[in-house]
Amino acid sequence: AWALTLGYMVFTLLNLGTLSFPTSVWTAQSGAAVRIDLGAEYDVAEIWTNGNIAEGSAVFTGDDGSTAEYTQKYATMFTWRTQTAAMHTRYITLQCTAGKVSLNEIAFFDAAGNRLPAVIAAGTTESAALLDEPNTVPDEPSYLNGMYFDEIYHARTAYEFLHTMSVYEWTHPPLGKILIMLGVVLFGMKPFGWRVVPALFGAAMLPVFFTLAKRLFRRRDLAFLAAALLALDTMHFTQTRIATVDVFILFFILLMVLFMTDYIQMDYMKEPLKKLFLPLGACGVSFGLGVASKWTGLYAGAGLAAMFFAHMIRAGISCRKDTAARREFWRRTWATVGFCCVFFLAIPALIYYLSYIPFFRYEATKPNGVGSIALVLQQQESMYHYHHDLTATHTCQSAWYEWPFTSRSVWFYFRSLGEKRVSSISSTGSPAVWWVSAVGAILLAVEALFRRTKKESAHWKQAGYILLIAIAANYLPWTLVPRCTFQYHFFTTFPFVVLAAILFLQHMEESGEVSGRVKWIWLSVAAAYFVLMYPAASGLPMPRLYAQFLEYVLPCGQLFFGAV
């Protein structure tokens, strides 16, 4: 498992994002201007800008009277934008015309694509930031050197947390953005910096998943199969290489289920309470961290409660005819309930409250800032109404019943590289993993719930119930959500679907109904599919013809939505 984790970590960090990115900032209010000298008269055909956090507009004006308008909005920060110009000039004046404009760097190009020399001719001391990092100007704008998809919310907010600014993204609890911020602290506000922590959490999932699978299957080969299938899933790859919070909630959910499984597999009546409380306490802390990252942790929490109470009831039934055992059961139960009140209620509430420290710090800078408890309550109300009242639609939205069969990807990024090449990132599950797992999970449910044969061990049945509860808890609530939803909302469910399919495969293999080679054939097909899909999952430039093959021939659903 560790070799797989190390190999995956190295692989996922490759081409994650650049460390060469402008960090000094020029900020101007309406009316402020700076004059730029190109050193000689040139024909300026293109202007590149890298924006910071601001909303406003500006105009580039050449000495020949020609202009190029620039508008800065929330979706245009921390990425390179190109705009055409038609200037024959030596001097260019950049003036903020409305609102506020904030730029990290600018560059000028002629029609042949040559970057033109430029220096500040007149302006404030701060205006030097516009041209002081020329080595950070890339050969071409791409996901490697700028934000894409929801990074404009989550990575931006990580920057705001770090600099005690007004917080833009408040529709999810803060912990995930705080974790993204740690990468920014270590590597700067650069694409690698805001993506590295999600990528490392994605790699760290593999040993957690391996350990959970080993607890459930009691076989290292099947545990390795589970971890390898997770590593080879295209959605896992894309979701853990982008600076959003989904990777964190899945990581903490896996920890929750792992620790609850450890607890359930211990003898409730024989093990010392201190030993029982170790995995139970770790589960509660993981639950708190999960909910502080995303509210969907509450769905998983409902599953934990179902597992916990089923285990307690089973233990109570086993000792109902023995007076002494029954007395001991209630002693343990009351102690456990008290422990759970601390670790599943008080500590998660404290973690959740403390995750709002960045909000508290910003409020403290205001003359009439909101108090901490009032602020947290206010944020919860705002979050609820945002998700409950959301009526927006999206090209990539899909219904919950479509997710297991990957019919509609979530299109993160696309750039046309001339007539023959494109670069794209589509977040979608691998049919080689998801389709097979969905069928296997259904067969497991039938076997566990309806057939009830005596061939399976008590441990196998227990593992089946754990997985079916985990699937139901993380998936079924989405059937009641009226707002538009996306395939990546299945991200917290599909690992348990994979485990359920492997558990059914174990049953078939150990009963002699299928060969032991089947699992390796499955893994080989998943690996081959990952190789085929890698360009569309990673942004690696590919021939347009190959993109058309992926879109129209390979059974992977909509990837590019007709763009190729």
Regions found by a protein language model. Give the residues of each.
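Transmembrane-helix signature of polytopic, membrane-embedded enzymes
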Residues: 204, 209-232, 250-251, 269-275
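Short hydrophobic/aromatic helix or loop-helix immediately within or flanking a transmembrane segment
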Residues: 152-162, 166-189, 200, 358, ...
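Transmembrane helical bundles and short interhelical boundary loops of multi-pass, membrane-embedded
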Residues: 1, 10-36, 128, 142, ...
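Transmembrane-helix motifs of polytopic, lipid-linked glycan transferases
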Residues: 192, 196-217, 255-259
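Short helix- or helix-capping micro-motifs
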Residues: 226-231, 238, 258, 287, ...
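Specific aromatic-rich, kink-prone transmembrane helix
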Residues: 208, 248-273, 285-287, 305, ...
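Short acidic/glycine- and proline-prone juxtamembrane loop motifs at membrane-interface regions
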Residues: 194, 198, 235-248, 293-296
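Aromatic-rich transmembrane-lumenal/periplasmic boundary elements in polytopic membrane proteins
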Residues: 113-158, 329, 348-406, 544-547, ...
